[in-house]
């Protein structure tokens, strides 16, 4: 996996985590 793809994946996980916290 490339560094760019990894950071992109990390960003996606962060977005999901934030939206999950917002729901609660």
Curated annotation (Swiss-Prot):
Gene Ontology biological process terms, A to Z: negative regulation of execution phase of apoptosis
Keywords: Cytoplasm, Secreted
Entries under Pfam families matching the protein: Humanin
GO molecular function annotations of the record: receptor antagonist activity
Record flagged with keyword Secreted: yes
CDD domains: humanin (cd20245)
Localization of this protein: Secreted; Cytoplasm
Tissue spec. comment: Expressed in mature brain, thyroid gland and testis.
Role, per record: Plays a role as a neuroprotective and antiapoptotic factor.
Name this polypeptide is given: Humanin-like 10
Record organism: Homo sapiens
